[in-house]
Structure formats: structure tokens, C-alpha cells
Amino acid sequence: MSSKRLVRSTTVLCVRRDGKVVMAADGQVTLGEGVIKHNARKLRRLYQDKIIAGFAGSTADAFSLFGRFESKLEQYHGNLSRAAVELGKDWRTDKMLRQLEALLLVADKDQTFLISGQGDVIEPDTGIAAIGSGGSYATAAATALLEHSTLDARQIAEEAMKIAGKICIYTNDRVTIEEL
């Protein structure tokens, strides 16, 4: 799967506002040019429900990464930044992991990280991060709403996902939301 194919997959968005953390993901699964599932769950709660994680890319690869990430969280006692960095290191150095094609978006009450297929671990500058084919649309919409409205984090995530779903053909309107 090429990196171009990787991002043609979904939209996962994380929004922070007023101490609330909300992650949202659409439910569409696309195989080639067709939609094969409309209500997939692309979000998970990890480490005693203190961390939310979402994925874009290959579903099988994402499940493998969720398992590894959960192991890192256990190993580092829920320290999100340490677990993310260690998973990133493994992803860069392990020959089998380098073959996995997925992106992870992970958040706890204090931090958000994007973990890429190249092993990059990126903490966004703002309270907004998104991955997947509709990520740019969701980020733009959420940024505008965060800066120019009084909507709470959940409302911003819901509205931004609606906008992304109207623009991105790989994103639908069946949104799953998790909050911290």
C-alpha cells in the first residue's frame, strides 16, 4: 500500500477546549473504490480509560499497533508521551513494524500525539489534530470553530466532522465520539 493510499481512508479528529478532550472518527471503510462498511469503530479507550486512540490506514495494521501501543502504556504506567516515543522508536527500527501502514492519533487529559508510519511522534501546537483523508478539512473547520465560536469541544468535533464528511469521499457522517 503506498502512502498515497494510506491517507485515503478516514477522518479522525481530536479537539481540546476548556479542559475537555474529544476524539471523533467517521465509520466508513473503503476497499479500493467501494465502501464496504459504514459504521466501523476507529476509536479505542486505553489504559484504564485514561487515553483515547484513533487510527487511519490499514485496519489490520492499526490493530497490531494498538496492541503494541497498549503494551507500551502498561510498561510506562500510562505515561502517554513516553509510550508514544517508544512506539515511534520501535516503528522506525523494527523491520516488521516498518511495513505497517497506519497513523495513530492518541490523547490523554494533557497531551495529544500523532504517531506516523515513519515513526514520527508529533505533538500539535494547537488543541486540534487530525489524521486521514479528511484530516485537513476537519482541522480547518475545527480551527475556525475554536477561534470564532463558543462551542464546546464536543460540539466543535461534531460540526467539523460533518464538514469533513461533506467534502471528503472517504469520510461519512456516522461519527463515533470519545471524551475525556
From Swiss-Prot:
Give the location in the cell: Cytoplasm
Say where the protein is mainly found: cytoplasm
**Mind telling me which GO cellular component terms the entry cites?**
HslUV protease complex; proteasome core complex
* Chain sites annotated for binding Na(+): G165, C168, T171
What S-S linkages are listed for this chain?
Answer: none
Keywords from UniProt, A to Z, are: Allosteric enzyme, Cytoplasm, Hydrolase, Metal-binding, Protease, Sodium, Threonine protease
List, in alphabetical order, the GO biological process terms annotated in this UniProt record.
Answer: proteolysis involved in protein catabolic process
The EC category is hydrolase
Please write the reaction equations for the catalytic activity of this protein: ATP-dependent cleavage of peptide bonds with broad specificity
**Pfam families per UniProt:** Proteasome
Q: Which GO terms describe its molecular function?
A: metal ion binding; threonine-type endopeptidase activity
> Which catalytic residues are annotated?
T10
What does UniProt list under activity regulation? Allosterically activated by HslU binding.
Q: What is its EC number?
A: 3.4.25.2
State whether it acts alone or in a complex, and with which partners, per the record: A double ring-shaped homohexamer of HslV is capped on each side by a ring-shaped HslU homohexamer. The assembly of the HslU/HslV complex is dependent on binding of ATP.
* Family that this chain belongs to: Belongs to the peptidase T1B family. HslV subfamily.
Alphabetical list of PANTHER family matching this protein = ATP-DEPENDENT PROTEASE SUBUNIT HSLV, METALLOPROTEASE TLDD
The record's section on NCBIfam families has: ATP_dep_HslV, PRK05456.1
Biological function: Protease subunit of a proteasome-like degradation complex believed to be a general protein degrading machinery.
Protein's name according to its UniProt entry: ATP-dependent protease subunit HslV
